[in-house]
Amino acid sequence: MSHSVKIYDTCIGCTQCVRACPTDVLEMIPWDGCKAKQIASAPRTEDCVGCKRCESACPTDFLSVRVYLWHETTRSMGLSY
């Protein structure tokens, strides 16, 4: 079961989440929407182990990166039994 990793537009391009990820799920990609000219991206969500270290590392007030564990995702969609 894979987890869902969402990157929000509040990302400031600091790379903290990328450096915190033990399985290299995240990477930085070019983006003109912030001063750093880069934003986090999650191209390898199948490797996410759900540790949420990226969330803990995020310095923004509203977490720019969120990991939704499989059971959290299905519960929010009303699919859990």
Swiss-Prot record:
Chain ranges of the 4Fe-4S ferredoxin-type domain: 2-31, 39-68
Catalytic activity from the UniProt record: reduced [plastocyanin] + hnu + oxidized [2Fe-2S]-[ferredoxin] = oxidized [plastocyanin] + reduced [2Fe-2S]-[ferredoxin]
Record's bilayer topology term: Peripheral membrane protein
Cofactor remark from the record: Binds 2 [4Fe-4S] clusters. Cluster 2 is most probably the spectroscopically characterized electron acceptor FA and cluster 1 is most probably FB.
Record-listed [4Fe-4S] cluster 1 binding positions: 11, 14, 17, 58
Domain of life assignment: Eukaryota
Subunit structure: The eukaryotic PSI reaction center is composed of at least 11 subunits.
The protein, known as: Photosystem I iron-sulfur center
Organism: Phalaenopsis aphrodite subsp. formosana
Gene: psaC
